[in-house]
Amino acid sequence: MERVDTFKEGKVYLVYDAEHHRMAVEKRLQGNFRIYEQLQALSHSYLPQLYAVSYTEDETIVWEEYITGKSLEQIPATEKQVTKWLFELCDVLRFLHQHHILHRDIKPSNLLLGSDGHIRLIDFDAAREEKEQAEMDTRLLGTRGYAPPEQYGFAQTDERADIYALGVTARELLGKAAKKRRWKHILKKCTALEPKKRYHHIWQITWAIRFGQIRHRLLYPLVFTGLALVTGFAVWGYATDTDVRGAM
């Protein structure tokens, strides 16, 4: 057993599962993290598989799939690659939200690129079940800079908290491309300080990105065609004017 990380809530080990002949991740978390029981019952292509969850008096022990791959923060990427990752992130978040689970700690370091070329969303230590009646979160977790204001105890979080973190993550991964017109509105709306000014559902972001792609593909050919026509008419007009003057 090899310890690979230590953090405030617990420790992470890389272990060998002799029974199934595979490497696995063992997480020992201080406290009761019942959210992992819900996650164990779910299956999605962009989530690591949870093998088992157990509890002691003061610990939650999780055994999950070991993903061989780098985090997205370690991978230089093109705008096209980042767009693909964002579609996949939207897909897995929509799945989680349909099951009333909020991740609450979305950031590039919690997104791994698997050997199959697809992302995996990891680290659900800050996750919780969405509760409509609650006024504020009971456990204030998340990463500063990625978590929205309401996640620090100002109000109860809902899926718009994940939308905020998705926006910050997208801006970081896109780099200079984030300043392009097609991204500016999307990222601004995702990261609005007031939850009511953000997108309310993940599918709206998927649609906005897709619409931006379509508009980009249609608009630029039209612009270039228009410029070509204007240039053509200008050249034709100049040539005609020259011919007329020559005839005179």
Regions found by a protein language model. Give the residues of each.
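Conserved C-terminal C-lobe helix
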Residues: 179-193
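Conserved HxN/HPN-centered segment at the entrance to the catalytic loop
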Residues: 43-52
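Catalytic-loop of the protein kinase fold
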Residues: 93, 97-113
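Conserved short submotifs of the Hanks-type protein kinase catalytic core
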Residues: 57-71
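ATP-binding glycine-rich loop module of kinase domains
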Residues: 2-37
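Conserved activation segment of eukaryotic-like protein kinases, specifically the C-terminal portion
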Residues: 136-150
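Conserved catalytic-loop aspartate of Hanks-type protein kinases
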Residues: 162
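Activation segment signature within eukaryotic-like protein kinase domains
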Residues: 85-86
